[in-house]
């Protein structure tokens, strides 16, 4: 048996199937393309679903891939078992109606016995209990003895997910030997012990399951196989754990070095090391595919993995950002196959570091909250933190549950784990409710996928704004209908159209479908499967029927406004890269007739000077009236001429290029102006952060920009009229007013301080002694919180030793301030608890430090009652 590394096994597999006339398809990005049912690519077959479902034509009948995958369903097991990981690679060979069982199994056997040189006597196979064909291939054609072919039932060897394509499967197993077994004489594949390792599953998609549970033979059966690369590496390298294979070991050793930890000395330490090793691979590859940390969707998965890894670094004694330092090792081991790790390495490191540093702040914030909870438990003489509070720490502040538990245990306290789990289940249910209708593997079809594949639309709208088309299909209320009457809404599919379907961030066209007998308002246009263009319509006049010939007329005003904004996004993208840096990539966009929104990768807000430069640069290109050219070319040639691609996007072999003069070159399928001068004017409205490492610009062009300037001019003129000055003098006049106001504020504050100082003498005369401590409790009239604090500071300085509690009502609001000198605090006084309890009586709350605190209330009538309790609370504090 050969001893091959991960990269060598991958290369052997792909080259073997290249020799079997398979197209070697590069791994798809982890972000599913055109598939809203999946959060992340989680299997080798997932990116190929459109081919298996017949929605798209595959590039060839035979394909082979090595697909990067992310799964987090068993995240709690990662690092604690030998085989669980969040990132893994799936090797697979696929046939779309070409070869079937015989070729799939015989080639599989050839690869593992000839290329990998696995010992024949160590190999077993399983087949579906009723699949005699597969059994015969294994036994008669390949020569595997009957006793090493195991028939298993539907749960093990039949692949199906709800309705649709399904079929039996056959798996190849490796026998690790009796030392790994359960000792049972009947031990064989299918046993729960660790002796037999399944490493290659061959799925024979030969049936179509209907709603009644009947299985109908498919006219063109498919092959879908999957081999876990890490699992095969374990076999080839003779190790028991995926964390001991070559690529993982290289990263793991770096983890040990950075964290000053030793592997295989302590199991708790080992778990943390393994979690970091696994998670940093997932994190790096996700960011490399354009995913960024956020609080929802795949961004939340990334954030959770990153923070979990950082948390385990903290358990190993690392109290700084460190994960980003491991990206070099990930790129060294995986960068040859996944070049985005190398191309975007600095960017990946920057995103990780920023998120790590944010998490460090979160941990500190969470500790402050947890300490407050602990303080409350001690005060109330309780020992169990509620599940609600533990969940709030976890959900709101990102504070890990196990860290909360550990800290509580150190202080002799515990937490209500049942209550915490109850809150977690409520959150899971909310997530499930939000996912209703989305199948786990994403095989659910809509009404349009079931239409005849011949129903396709030829898009003619790049150069035409009105074309004639024939109605091929009408869908109303999720039902295919023959006609649609006046007043009703439907989706209409034509054989030809000028309407652009929503895509690439650009909204769909609106307009009219009409002939002499019927008129339909097109409210929106969307792309559908099988090259369909969906016209979302309302029938204004007549009845639309299948077979009708209509004219499809795009609304020119909105189309041109959208085109201006779309071309402007290209100019903006290039200007950002010129002025801010080459690290800027498009992270998303929205192009509408009214405005454009452009998300880009960057880690800090743009300066005023940068914004000015960007706006000027874009407007310069507009004034230069550059020709806008579009053409189709190969993806390789597009890259050679420097065409910018969307970060994390997957493109076909032929792409559409949009060039604005010699200034901007991008891959784009949208509609554009023919000359940059048609944009007219470009104005940035705002620039802000939307996620870690992602900024957003909103801007306007054309008439919207002109109206904006006009409105601002009118506003400035009105300000000038109000200030009784000329427009050119407005800024100077406002600056004078601001200066005058500040001077008056200073005078007012000075007078307030004098009044406060003068009034403190009378207040101090009312001081009483409680437990040997001077205490001042006083109600003052109409004082804001700042004023109360100033008076409190003066009193604290004059009293020398003691406690001051002041209250004041202002309209419907109550303010409280409490202060205590150092010696009073040392005797047990806690200003925060004093003011918190007092504020409760006045319908409010608050708190703070032992020496200074403030609170608010909503019931001015209770202010005196609240302050009357202060001395009683003080006595209790001193007696504890």
Curated annotation (Swiss-Prot):
Catalysis performed (reactions): tRNA(Ala) + L-alanine + ATP = L-alanyl-tRNA(Ala) + AMP + diphosphate
Names of required cofactors: Zn(2+)
Record's keyword terms, sorted: Aminoacyl-tRNA synthetase, ATP-binding, Cytoplasm, Ligase, Metal-binding, Nucleotide-binding, Protein biosynthesis, RNA-binding, tRNA-binding, Zinc
Gene3D superfamilies (UniProt xref): 2.40.30.130, 3.10.310.40, 3.30.54.20, 6.10.250.550, Bira Bifunctional Protein, Domain 2, Threonyl-trna Synthetase, Chain A, domain 2
Main location: cytoplasm
UniProt record similarity statement: Belongs to the class-II aminoacyl-tRNA synthetase family.
Comment block on domains: Consists of three domains; the N-terminal catalytic domain, the editing domain and the C-terminal C-Ala domain. The editing domain removes incorrectly charged amino acids, while the C-Ala domain, along with tRNA(Ala), serves as a bridge to cooperatively bring together the editing and aminoacylation centers thus stimulating deacylation of misacylated tRNAs.
Protein name stated in the entry: Alanine--tRNA ligase
Organism: Alkaliphilus oremlandii (strain OhILAs) (Clostridium oremlandii (strain OhILAs))
Recorded name of the encoding gene: alaS
């Amino acid at each position: 048996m050969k001893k091959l590394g991960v990269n060598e096994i991958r290369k052997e597999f792909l080259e073997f199937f290249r020799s079997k006339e398979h197209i070697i398809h590069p791994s798809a990005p982890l972000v599913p393309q055109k598939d809203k049912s999946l959060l992340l690519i989680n299997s080798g077959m997932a990116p190929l679903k459109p081919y298996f479902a017949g929605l798209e034509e595959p590039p060839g009948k035979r394909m082979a891939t090595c697909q990067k995958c992310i799964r987090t369903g068993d995240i709690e097991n990662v690092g604690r078992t030998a085989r669980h990981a969040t990132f893994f690679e799936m090797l697979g060979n696929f046939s779309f109606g070409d070869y079937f069982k015989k070729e799939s199994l015989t080639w599989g056997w050839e690869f593992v016995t000839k290329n990998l040189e696995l010992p024949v006597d160590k190999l077993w196979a399983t087949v579906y209990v009723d699949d005699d064909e597969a059994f015969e291939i294994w036994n008669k054609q390949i020569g595997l003895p009957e006793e090493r072919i195991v028939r298993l039932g539907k749960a093990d060897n039949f692949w199906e997910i709800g309705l649709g394509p399904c079929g039996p499967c056959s798996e190849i197993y490796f026998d690790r030997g009796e030392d790994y077994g359960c000792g049972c004489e009947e031990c064989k594949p299918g046993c729960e012990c660790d002796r037999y390792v399944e490493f290659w599953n061959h799925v024979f998609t030969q049936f179509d399951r209907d709603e009644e549970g009947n299985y109908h033979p498919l006219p063109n059966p498919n092959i879908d196989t999957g081999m876990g690369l890490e699992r095969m590496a374990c076999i080839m390298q003779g190790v028991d754990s995926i964390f001991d294979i070559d690529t993982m070991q290289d990263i793991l050793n770096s983890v040990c070095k950075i964290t000053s930890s030793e592997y295989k000395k302590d199991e708790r330490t080992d778990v943390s090391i393994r979690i970091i090793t696994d998670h940093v691979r997932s994190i790096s590859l996700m960011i490399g595919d354009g995913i960024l940390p956020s609080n929802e969707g795949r961004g939340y998965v990334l954030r959770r993995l990153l923070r979990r890894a950082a948390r385990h670094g903290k358990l190993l004694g690392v109290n700084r950002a460190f994960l980003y330092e491991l990206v070099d090792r990930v790129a060294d081991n995986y960068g040859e196959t996944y070049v985005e790790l190398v191309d975007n390495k600095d960017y990946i490191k920057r995103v990780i570091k920023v998120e790590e540093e944010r998490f460090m702040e979160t941990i500190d914030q969470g500790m402050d909250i947890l300490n407050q909870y602990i303080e409350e438990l001690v005060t109330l003489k309780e020992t169990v933190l509620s599940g609600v509070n533990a969940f709030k720490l976890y959900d709101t502040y990102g504070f890990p549950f196990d860290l909360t538990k550990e800290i509580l245990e150190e202080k002799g306290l515990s937490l209500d784990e049942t209550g915490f789990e109850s809150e977690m289940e409520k959150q899971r249910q909310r997530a499930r409710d939000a996912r209703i209708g989305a199948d786990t593997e994403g095989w659910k079809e809509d009404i349009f996928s079931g239409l005849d594949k011949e129903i396709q639309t030829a898009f003619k709208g790049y150069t035409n704004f009105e074309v004639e088309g024939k109605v091929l299909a009408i869908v109303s209320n999720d039902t295919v209908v023959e006609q649609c009457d006046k007043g009703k809404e439907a989706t209409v599919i034509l054989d030809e159209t000028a309407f652009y379907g929503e895509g690439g961030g650009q909204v769909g066209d609106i307009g009219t479908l009409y002939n002499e007998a019927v008129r339909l308002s097109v409210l929106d246009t969307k792309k559908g499967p099988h090259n369909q263009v969906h016209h979302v319509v309302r029938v204004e006049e007549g009845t639309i029927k299948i077979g009708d010939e209509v004219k499809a007329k795009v609304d020119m005003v909105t189309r041109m406004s959208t085109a201006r904004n779309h071309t402007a996004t290209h100019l903006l993208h290039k200007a950002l890269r010129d002025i801010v840096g080459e690290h800027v990539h498009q992270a998303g966009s929205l192009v509408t007739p009214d405005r454009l929104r452009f998300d880009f990768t960057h880690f800090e807000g743009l300066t005023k000077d940068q914004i000015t430069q960007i706006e000027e640069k874009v407007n310069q290109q507009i004034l230069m009236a550059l020709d806008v050219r579009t053409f189709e070319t190969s993806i390789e040639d597009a890259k050679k001429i420097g065409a910018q691609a969307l970060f994390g996007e997957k493109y076909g072999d032929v792409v559409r290029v949009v060039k604005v003069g010699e200034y901007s070159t991008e891959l784009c399928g949208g509609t554009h102006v023919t000359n940059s001068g048609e944009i007219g004017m470009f104005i940035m409205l705002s620039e802000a952060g939307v996620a870690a490492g992602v900024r957003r610009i909103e801007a306007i062009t054309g008439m919207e920009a002109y109206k904006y300037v006009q409105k601002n001019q009118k506003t400035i003129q009105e300000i000038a009229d109000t200030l009784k000055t000329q427009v050119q003098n407005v800024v100077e006049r406002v600056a004078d007013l601001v200066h005058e106001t500040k001077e008056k504020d200073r005078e007012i504050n000075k007078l307030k301080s004098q009044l406060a100082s003068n009034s403190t003498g009378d207040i101090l005369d009312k001081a009483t002694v409680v437990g040997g401590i001077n205490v001042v409790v006083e109600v003052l009239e109409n004082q804001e919180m700042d004023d109360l604090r100033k008076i409190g500071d003066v009193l604290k300085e004059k009293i020398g030793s003691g406690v001051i509690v002041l209250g004041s009502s202002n309209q419907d609001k109550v303010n409280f301030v409490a202060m205590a000198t150092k010696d009073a605090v040392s005797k047990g006084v806690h200003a925060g608890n004093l003011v918190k309890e007092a504020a409760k009586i006045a319908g409010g709350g608050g708190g703070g430090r032992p020496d200074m605190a403030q609170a608010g209330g909503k019931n001015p009538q209770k202010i005196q009652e609240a302050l009357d309790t202060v001395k009683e609370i003080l006595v209790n504090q001193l007696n504890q």
